[in-house]
């Protein structure tokens, strides 16, 4: 018994749709975190992407001892971590301000003000760990005997 035209038509249609879906699909695209890291590399002189792991991208720059970009944590959407000497140089503040302006889409002077305020507040009166909020960014600065670090995040709901 031969298959009638009513059975062939749906089969051909399904095969054609599967073929279009296979070849017509867009190519795989890098996620937003990798795009942000590439944009940072293109915009900031001396910045290099060193290692990409899961949701952390480690970066290198002469002004910072450590520099990383974290994406999609439990409580934040994007995180910028940087570490420098105990008394950071102005180049470090410029680096964090430039990176913060690109990542969090805020003006560079605002990012510079927030990061420098956070790091400069550490001392005898406020201690070696300072948490503050500036322009909808959460900043946490910590200091040891030899180095200072800053973590800049934006919450998921903002």
Residue map of PLM features:
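Bacterial N-terminal signal peptides
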Residues: 14-22
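Secreted/processed peptides and extracellular or luminal domains of membrane proteins
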Residues: 39-40, 77, 124, 147
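Amphipathic N-proximal alpha-helical interface segments
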Residues: 52-94, 129-158
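Short N-terminal segments immediately surrounding and downstream of signal-peptide cleavage
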Residues: 30-50
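Long, charged/polar, surface-exposed segments that mediate recognition or autoinhibition
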Residues: 72-122
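Short glycine-rich, low-complexity/disordered patches
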Residues: 28, 49-56, 105-135
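Bacterial N-terminal signal peptides that target proteins for export
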Residues: 2-15
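Sec/Tat signal peptide C-region and signal peptidase I cleavage site
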Residues: 24-30
């Amino acid at each position: 018994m031969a298959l009638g035209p009513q059975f062939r038509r749906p089969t051909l249609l399904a095969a054609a749709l599967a073929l279009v879906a296979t070849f017509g699909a867009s190519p795989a695209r890098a996620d937003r975190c990798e795009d942000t890291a590439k944009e940072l590399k293109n915009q900031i002189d001396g910045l290099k992407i060193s290692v990409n792991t899961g949701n952390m991208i480690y970066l290198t720059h002469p002004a910072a001892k450590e520099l990383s970009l974290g994406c999609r944590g439990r409580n934040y959407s994007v995180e910028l971590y940087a570490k420098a000497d105990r008394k950071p140089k102005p180049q470090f503040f410029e680096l964090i301000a430039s990176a913060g302006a690109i990542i969090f889409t805020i003006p560079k002077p605002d990012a510079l003000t927030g990061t420098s305020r956070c790091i400069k507040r550490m001392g005898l009166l406020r201690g070696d760990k300072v948490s503050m909020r500036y322009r909808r960014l959460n900043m946490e600065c910590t200091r040891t005997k030899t180095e200072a670090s800053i973590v800049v995040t934006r919450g998921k709901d903002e």
